């Protein structure tokens, strides 16, 4: 007989919502546990089976911690601004707010149907003005501290669409919508100075419990490099440019320089004879993305400007080229080329027949660049020195002659924070006619995103907000000065940078969150989500958190103490699930056919939480069969509690039960849910073999099952005679003394060969073991006619008799 999952699951979901079972307490007398999921973007497609994997993991921890006496904060919300809703609005003419609300309602319904123990009174939505008021407030604080500024940055401009495109909207130099040509064009953009926090973002990784692979991704993204800035004069011009190099010791081997085509000096220094070729080259590369430009496998392209730099060490002339593999947004936008000792420079020099001069001993530069270490040669006062010594000496020379200085740089660039979009948080800045800018006052926040039917490109590179004149154009009531509101909006990252803080105090209209509540709940104890957010989201959230720490808003330096990335659930064919492949599994279908508890159990039992594993209908059926076995063990045909469940204690299941409590608790704590479930299965197998199931063990088992299969557990808990929910019952304890076997199995060897296995008292002495072995019928038979020479007894293990 199987249980009626539709009826039972609806009954308990209604109960939890009505009774606010999972409402968070802010009491001071309990330890706290904050379990956070990466909140979803509410897409039109709805939830897929990949979402519940991480959500079930945090839910298991949350349910267990409540039963262990913790105050648990386990919230859910919506990362609801973003490009898809805007594209939908452009395609249909419908309001993205309405579309978003419909999607959120669908997501909420789906999530509630899976029985997660969220506190729905704390639900947040990044598009709610009461939420983005505080996103705007954080921006104003960054602006006040000089960490938000405007800069000219190359962007993807599509002339045909009259709009700026995100990198993911550009495919092979053309717009995803309509296939129109896209070019790189400099535009004024808001930037956030994340580089000011680079060292702290790097150093504080040591203090948090994150997978080492994720920490390495963050370290590589930040990319700290020690080296030198070298200043190059330009022959015949009163100009100079600066390059950063980690190998200033190879400066004697620098034979040419390369500037990014967008570098500010290119126009000034290009000679008349080269002007046409340089302009043609710049036009040609305008449609290339940064990724295409820096592709190592592509053929090197470039153009000579006609100008020469002067090598500061030896005064030699170095031709200045431009090439697309040097980016204006990376480093200083200029490099010194040492082709003898750098593969990319070598390839470029060979392509354009530029001089190659070896300055480090080793290798054969006729064949390839030598990138190893060695003594310096052809380097004047550096000759004979090793790398480290030569670097120190050349930096000292550069500093003494004011031709350069020691420098630490970062791969990390400041964060481009503006989007030419409608569906995002308005940036609370006004630009005045006299060229000044000022922030919207805090009292006037939130600056509401205006409703409009004109969600179409402005044609000027500004966002569609530029079309709404009565919103954009303002007059200072005091001075009468005219101004225009900032028309760019914030990126989707903005709302997700700090959402975990708002869950702590979601209805506070006076401040981002109360300091007392932030002190109680921070940092987040466990954060579970997909590895695709391992770099940018986590880096941006850490940056904002550190900034808020600096201005006294939050009490911790880091937001997330423990981070875990769940793996991906693949289609049955081991391919990534996607609509185009037709292999997407909808959780609604599984909840209907097998039940939410089955889906939760199956996704946790598939394998390790961080592994990527293929979906299997057979595995899903197996998970349901296990829950049916539990139901049949606990209940009679008429639905009453089984006669097998008795009031007696101890008995045959004693050791199995205590071992199950110990192992399941340990495995849940360690996020090893698959092995925890295996142990639950072991106990059920043992319970079927036993004549009776002590009620104490039945209740303990139901508690252990409840984080995984909460609906079934609630129903069984009621059938065991309890009122209300199991959610706050005490988590089972195990007795270590019950884990020790009274008896153990030992082997008996004759001349080193196993002849028998005996079950003996666990505390038997050597003498007792010897007597037991000698008196065993099989051993006696083997010893007949032999003389015992020696007996070796090892308690708990073996007896070896030497005889001949």
Swiss-Prot record:
Name of the top EC class for this enzyme: ligase
GO cellular component term, pick one: cytosol
Motif 'KMSKS' region in this chain: 576-580
SUPFAM superfamilies with a match to the protein in the record: Anticodon-binding domain of a subclass of class I aminoacyl-tRNA synthetases, Nucleotidylyl transferase, ValRS/IleRS/LeuRS editing domain
Protein's GO biological process: leucyl-tRNA aminoacylation
Positions that bind ATP: 579
One of the record's GO molecular function terms: ATP binding
Motif extent ('HIGH' region): 40-51
EC number per UniProt: 6.1.1.4
Superkingdom in the source lineage: Bacteria
Key words of the record: Aminoacyl-tRNA synthetase, ATP-binding, Cytoplasm, Ligase, Nucleotide-binding, Protein biosynthesis
Catalytic activity: tRNA(Leu) + L-leucine + ATP = L-leucyl-tRNA(Leu) + AMP + diphosphate
Subcellular location: Cytoplasm
Protein family: Belongs to the class-I aminoacyl-tRNA synthetase family.
Full protein name: Leucine--tRNA ligase
Source species of the chain: Bacillus pumilus (strain SAFR-032)
